[in-house]
């Protein structure tokens, strides 16, 4: 199952000041989870502000294939009538998650707790990504792999557990996907399922499980970790969910406003969950003018309005423990670092190697081809900022939406235009990115 979309190259050119007030699309992590937990609940769940990108829509299709009723009731407005915990039905065909590792891995967890078999598949990029570390704990809980591609990759057929077992599991890396898969499988198990993390990963699953009525406790573990315990076999009840704007998507117009001289942007309803705001903290350390106002929350998730103005940035060192709170933002942070004065060292980025592409190498290549001095030392990325970027390069996106958007942001302030080989995959997370940036003043051709 591969995308047959024709490549759509695009060029970004030095732009006038970016101005305006926008709400970027709904958060992708929350959107996936709202659909999945709505499907595992009894009764009706209404979702406002759902991200209608390809990744999330593939999760919606999977929930329908597993027996839930999922319907669009208006723009970004959806309704889910769930089947209850353990109530998924055997799907008639393979579940195709396209480019989405999050959707695929979370649904694996939910299916593992049901006595059904389901085949998981995706595009060429998703087929290349590791699944073993998701499947390993699910097998401890009673699920089994009937078939998979070499190395335990997709396409993969998972047989859910007839009698799921609660486990205590220590995650090998800080990964919200591993944690969430175990917790979603644990919903069907009697007793308490516990996940221990050495480094705390994003906690959207825990917050939303509470919102839907699960009994879940999270306590500190060690210096940076968490211990999360879920009581199994709850009756989850449908609930309203307002999806905040995605901080990972807000990162692109935010960095663009910082590097394009004279820019002044307002970004509304951006999620400010502390486990997702590593980029905002880092940009402020670099000297960015970012003001927060209108703080509120919904379904346990805080949000705020941000005013971002063009700023003179300086190089900083980003500690490795910040990685889980900004794992998707390092690409666009590297762009900000290239326009800063001085050296920026981003430490401990090993997880970037197993994303939609090897994002560590791809980020270095994106900068290098545009005249930026960059190095990789172990799992660290080092960018030598000189206050400007020569540009003029052609960036290979490797079917990765975040590389495409980061390169386009860079071209808005570089000396020469930046060419991107393909923008088709931007639709996976931010379908409106190009028209929205144009409305703010971006020069794309």
Swiss-Prot record:
It catalyses: 3-phosphoshikimate + phosphoenolpyruvate = 5-O-(1-carboxyvinyl)-3-phosphoshikimate + phosphate. Phosphoenolpyruvate binds at residues 28, 101, 129, 177, 359, 402. Keywords: Amino-acid biosynthesis, Aromatic amino acid biosynthesis, Cytoplasm, Transferase. It comes from the Bacteria. Its EC number is 2.5.1.19. Coiled coil: none annotated. PANTHER family: AROM/DEHYDROQUINATE SYNTHASE, PENTAFUNCTIONAL AROM POLYPEPTIDE. This is 3-phosphoshikimate 1-carboxyvinyltransferase. It comes from Rhodopseudomonas palustris (strain BisA53). The gene is aroA.
């Amino acid at each position: 199952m591969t995308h047959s979309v024709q490549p759509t190259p695009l060029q970004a050119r030095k732009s006038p000041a970016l101005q305006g007030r926008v709400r970027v699309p709904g958060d992708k992590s929350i959107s996936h989870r709202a659909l999945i937990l709505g499907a595992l609940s009894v009764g009706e769940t209404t979702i406002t502000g759902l991200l209608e990108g390809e990744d999330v829509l593939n999760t919606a299709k999977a929930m329908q294939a597993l027996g839930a009723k999922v319907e669009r009731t208006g723009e970004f407005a959806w309704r889910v009538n769930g089947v209850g915990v353990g109530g998924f039905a055997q799907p008639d065909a393979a579940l195709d998650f396209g480019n989405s590792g999050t959707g695929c891995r979370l649904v694996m967890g939910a299916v593992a707790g049901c006595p059904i078999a389901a085949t998981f598949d995706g595009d060429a990029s998703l087929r290349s990504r590791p699944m073993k570390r998701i499947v390993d704990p699910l097998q401890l809980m009673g699920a089994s792999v009937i078939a998979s591609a070499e190395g335990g990759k997709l396409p993969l057929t998972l047989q859910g557990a007839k009698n799921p077992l609660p486990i205590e599991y220590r995650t090998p890396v800080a990964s919200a996907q591993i944690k969430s898969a175990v917790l979603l499988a644990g919903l069907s198990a009697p007793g308490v399922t516990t996940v221990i993390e050495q480094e705390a990963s994003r906690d959207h699953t825990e917050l939303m499980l509470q919102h839907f009525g699960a009994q879940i406790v999270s306590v500190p573990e060690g210096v940076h970790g968490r211990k999360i315990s879920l009581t199994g076999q709850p009756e989850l009840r449908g609930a309203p969910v307002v999806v905040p704007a995605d901080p990972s998507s807000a990162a692109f117009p935010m960095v663009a406003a910082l590097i394009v001289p004279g820019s002044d942007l307002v970004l509304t309803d951006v999620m400010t969950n502390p486990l997702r705001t590593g980029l905002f903290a880092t940009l402020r350390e670099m000297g960015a003018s970012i003001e927060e106002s209108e703080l509120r929350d919904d379904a346990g998730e805080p949000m705020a309005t941000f005013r971002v103005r063009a700023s003179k940035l300086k190089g900083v060192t980003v500690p490795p423990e910040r990685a889980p709170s900004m794992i998707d933002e390092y690409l666009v942070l590297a762009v900000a670092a290239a326009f800063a004065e001085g050296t920026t060292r981003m430490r401990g980025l090993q997880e970037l190697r197993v994303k939609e592409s090897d994002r560590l190498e791809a980020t270095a290549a994106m900068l290098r081809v545009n005249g930026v001095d960059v190095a990789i030392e172990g799992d660290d990325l080092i960018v030598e900022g000189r206050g400007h970027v020569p540009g003029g390069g052609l960036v290979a996106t490797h079917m990765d939406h975040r590389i495409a958007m980061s390169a386009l942001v860079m071209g808005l302030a570089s000396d020469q235009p930046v060419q991107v080989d393909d923008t088709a995959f931007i639709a996976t997370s931010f379908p409106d990115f190009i028209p929205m940036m144009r409305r703010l003043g971006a020069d794309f051709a």
